[in-house]
Amino acid sequence: MRTAERKESMNIAFLLQPKSDTAFLYDDFTLRQGLEKMRHHGYTAIPVIDREGKYITTISEGDFLWFILRDSEEGDLQEVPLQNLEKTQIKDIIHQDKNPPVPITATTDELVERGMEQNFIPVVDDWGSFIGIITRRNLLERFAKYKD
């Protein structure tokens, strides 16, 4: 790896919000647990990981809403069986292709591309374990600093 590439890769670590400071859901959480955590943090989307710490996907409010609508009888929200929020796990409603992660070795160019499409970018280590996120805000702040 050339020196310039190595510097670019290392720079993304400075943007990383570590897993310990990031809200996430486990894929075996119930829908109720997921919704409560999202409401508590005020998020509209949140990373999902398995119990081994591997990043799976990102789940959004829309994923919950579409499940509830599909689960209701003929789309009538007054007929939604709320007990299904207690029985259904996150892994039963997720779509694996949302917000793909980047490796910690990703370049800033890759981050910019992803940041244009995603509010946050999940970051994984060499083994696919979730290590944190880079928010669009952090990315923009970093570039604003270097603009001057």
Task: List the predicted regions and their residue ranges.
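Tandem CBS (Cystathionine beta-synthase) repeat/Bateman regulatory domains
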Residues: 1-148
